């Protein structure tokens, strides 16, 4: 963090629970100018915090419930987070050139979170801006409207089955090992013909493609599913590249340059330059 320090506990907002993540990702903006939009503001405590974090710029909030007396220079609007009409109005009246920072702390429901992101990212978030989704992990709560009990394995991906006993390789694994052993590039002399070296590398990789594990299903309920879609969007430059095979016109004009996922939040950073993809 390069900017001034703020203590969110003084404002009564739950942002205090993960303020260090905010400081790491957007702290360099504190003390300067920023146009801010927050979806879901309840009593408006976070609007007071943003008003102090940024010395100038619009501070706006949208909530289903009215906020008759917003703090400081903040302005509050009543409406649904996914309603383009209210979102357009807020932007038109406060940040016609776009917002530098948008925080979604509203419904925490996948359908509405996705709708808000899709519209605001393309229409009202400035190039170089940051979009934040708070409390996405409620998708793992069975009691949440679109949540669901997690049924997967919580052990690290590299850890073998819990039994700890070495399992004999099956037919597919046996074939894979033998093909890789023959095609291992290190077994092909560096002085061999380039085409032979290329064939060895291709065979080595093909052995995994044909017999190895290629899919790793995960929890895709609610906002957790949205976060995983965002991971796909972060790799848009690879998806639309020559090896990805997806039409290049599918790449957003201002794609994602970086996505940071924490247990509570997702920070999505937007490219400053059109066509600038993620660093993959």
Regions found by a protein language model. Give the residues of each.
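A short alpha-helical cap/connector motif
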Residues: 1-103, 107-132, 137-280
């Amino acid at each position: 963090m390069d900017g001034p320090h703020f203590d969110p506990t003084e404002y009564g907002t739950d942002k205090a629970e993960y303020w260090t993540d905010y400081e790491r990702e957007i702290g360099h903006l504190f003390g300067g100018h920023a146009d801010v939009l927050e979806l879901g503001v309840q009593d408006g405590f976070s609007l007071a915090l943003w008003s102090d974090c940024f010395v100038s710029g619009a501070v706006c909030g949208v909530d289903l419930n009215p906020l008759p007396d917003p703090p400081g220079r903040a302005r509050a609007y009543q409406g649904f987070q996914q309603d383009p009409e209210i979102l357009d109005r807020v932007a038109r009246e406060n940040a016609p050139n776009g917002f530098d920072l948008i925080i979604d702390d509203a419904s925490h429901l996948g359908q509405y979170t996705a709708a808000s992101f899709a519209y605001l990212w393309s229409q009202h978030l400035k190039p170089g801006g940051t979009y934040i989704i708070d409390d996405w992990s409620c998708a793992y709560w069975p009691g949440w409207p679109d949540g669901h009990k997690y049924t997967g394995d919580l052990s690290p991906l590299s850890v073998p089955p819990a039994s700890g006993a070495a399992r004999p390789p099956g037919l597919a694994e046996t074939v894979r090992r033998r093909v890789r052993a023959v095609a291992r590039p290190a077994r092909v002399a560096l002085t061999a013909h380039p085409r032979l070296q290329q064939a060895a590398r291709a065979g080595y990789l093909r052995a995994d493609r044909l017999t190895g594990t290629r899919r790793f299903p995960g929890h895709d309920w609610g906002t957790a599913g949205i976060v995983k879609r965002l991971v796909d969007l972060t790799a848009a430059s690879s998806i639309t590249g020559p090896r990805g095979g997806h039409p290049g016109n599918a790449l957003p004009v201002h794609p994602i340059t970086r996505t940071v996922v924490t247990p509570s939040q997702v920070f999505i950073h937007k490219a400053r330059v059109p066509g600038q993809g993620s660093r993959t």
